[in-house]
Amino acid sequence: MPRSLKKGPFIDLHLLKKVEKAVESGDKKPVKTWSRRSMIIPQMIGLTIAVHNGRQHVPVFVSEEMIGHKLGEFAPTRTYRGHAADKKAKKR
């Protein structure tokens, strides 16, 4: 169920401060964050945000289409290596 419109988007305060600081200084370095639950807001457009996936920080370049989505959607946490191959088929 989506978040109520009257509540507005959720964004961690520490991330919001980092974003505002990066925007006013014009800094191009990635903003490092562990907050996967924060929503992408219009102020973040053009910034690169390094989102933690449990192992490393994945760089995410924010574009207009991403507004309203959460940061965690763009940093996958699981690596899919495929299903186990059939051993009988390999021997042939």
From Swiss-Prot:
HAMAP family for this protein: Ribosomal_uS19 (MF_00531)
GO molecular function terms listed in the Swiss-Prot or TrEMBL record: rRNA binding; structural constituent of ribosome
UniProt function note: Protein S19 forms a complex with S13 that binds strongly to the 16S ribosomal RNA.
Pfam families: Ribosomal_S19
Protein name: Small ribosomal subunit protein uS19
Gene responsible for this protein: rpsS
Alphabetized UniProt keyword annotations: Ribonucleoprotein, Ribosomal protein, RNA-binding, rRNA-binding
Any GO BP: translation
PROSITE patterns in UniProt: RIBOSOMAL_S19 (PS00323)
Organism name: Photobacterium profundum (strain SS9)
Domain of life where this protein originates: Bacteria
One Gene Ontology cellular component: cytoplasm
